[in-house]
Amino acid sequence: MPGLIRRTLLIGGAAAAVAAATLYWRARSQGATEVAYGADPRQVLDVTLPNGDGPFPVLVMVHGGAFQMGDKSDLPIPVDVLDAGIAVVRVNYRLSGTDPWPAQADDCLAAIVHLQREGAALGLDPSRLVLLGHSAGAFLAVSTALSLVEVGLSPRGVVSLYGPMDFSTMDADMATLGRVPAMGATDAPDSPESLLLGYPVAENRALARRMGPIGRLDQIREPLPPILIRHGDADPLVADLQAKRLREAWLAADPQAQIDYALVPGAGHGGEPFETGKVAEDILAFLTATLT
């Protein structure tokens, strides 16, 4: 019964709402099964299974795109994750140009609910699941993980790659590092973050903080899943101090949490440094440790 209650709460909340490491991000062009988790055309995910017999543990990947663009097909299916016996799920969600916050969070959570309900039929073991996101997708992956924690359905882990974590401090963090944001100020009315929220970040900084992972972590004092955080120390869009804030807030919420945090020297916002070499190796090791 407790499991049923937790599941009911989760469903209600959702409704209301890449040497060898290079292989990590090599695309696999076939074998993905498209699945609708809602009625909107953007509410779809795809599932790629490893060879062999399931059910398989799951890596759920959330694409970036400043909340206003992007598609799950932008994410290459990581072959060595499949080779490790882990299924790959890529999620689409509604975009801010047509659907403001919290539609994106609602969709990511609804996708997880769908996997929990229908995972067995898809060859998946949704009780063994890690969320991974890039950029805006990292914001959503971490947010979804926290929603799951809040209803007692914590994922096995989270991977956050160069994501914004607190809209209210993004400009200040860039200023601290002596940088000018390449896409303009987050506080501006036409920033991706302001357009997502439906109001300029500068006009309601407290609310902009409260809705994001850092603000939510302020209110959490319970066990959190392991997290891997990687961010370029030359990121021109999102200051690496956002990753540091995430690490510190995660630890404050759960002093016993397992946190694998590192900056990527010379790396900007995404690209090859996150697709090959050490970062790819680290992600695969994290997935293997938490899922298999």
Which residues does each PLM region occupy?
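Alpha/beta-hydrolase superfamily serine-hydrolase fold, recognizing
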Residues: L4, L9-T292
